[in-house]
Amino acid sequence: MALDRRTMIVEAATKSFSLFGYKATTMDQVARLANVGKGTIYTFFKNKEELFEEIISTLVKEMIAEAESVIVPELPFTENVHLTLTRLLAFRSQHQLMIKLVQEEKEMGTLAVSEKLRHVEDEIIAYLRKKIEIAISKGAIPPGNTEITSFLLLKMYIALVSDWERNHEPLSSEQIAEVMKIFLIRGLPN
C-alpha cells in the first residue's frame, strides 16, 4: 500500500511539473492530484526538491532505455550513434515534462530546473562516453578524449538537428549521419 501511494505521488508530481513547471508546482497541488494528504508526501520525500530529483532520475533511466532500444549490434558504431541520438532528442522533444522544463529554463531561468537539465545532459554524455569507450576498444573509432568526444557529439548533433534548421533547409538523417561519421572517424578535412 505504501509503495502504491509513493507511486501515486510521483505520478501526480510528474503531471503537475509537466503542466505547471517546477516553480509553479506546490506540494498542495501534488497532494490533490495524488489524492493523498500533504503529510503523506512528506513521509516519502522531505521536500519538493527531493521529489523532483526522483522524477528526473526516473526520466534519465527512461531515456537510457529508449537509447538502448534502438541499438543494432550489427550496424557500424556511427550509425548506432545516430540512431541513439535521434531517439534521445525525440524523447526530449516529445516528453511533456522535458518540454515544460526546457520552456521554464528559457523563460524564467529557474535554478533548480537548470541544474536538473544539466544533470540530464551530463547523463546523456556519460552514456555516450561508455559507448565511445567500447567503440575505441573494438577499434571502431580512433582513440581520443572520450568525455570531450561525447560532449561534442551531443552538441554537434543538436546543432545539426535544431540550430541548422533556423537558417537552412533541414538535413536528412543520412546527411546528419555522414557529417557525424566524418567528424567522428575521419576528423576534420585538411
Give the location of each predicted region.
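C-terminal peripheral helix-coil segments that are non-catalytic and often amphipathic
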Residues: 83, 87-90, 126, 130-138, ...
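Basic, helix-initiating cap at the start of DNA-binding domains
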Residues: 1-20, 24-36, 49-53, 62
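Amphipathic alpha-helical packing segments from all-alpha helical-bundle domains
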Residues: 61-64, 68, 112-138, 147-151, ...
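Hydrophobic alpha-helical connector segments
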Residues: 54, 68-94, 149-153, 177
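Base-recognition residues in the alpha-helical recognition helix of bacterial helix-turn-helix
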Residues: 18, 42-46, 58
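Short coil/turn segments at alpha/beta junctions that flank glycine-rich nucleotide-binding fingerprints
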Residues: 19-23, 74, 95, 138-139
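Key DNA-contact positions within bacterial/archaeal DNA-binding proteins
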Residues: 39
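Short secondary-structure transition hinges
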Residues: 89-129
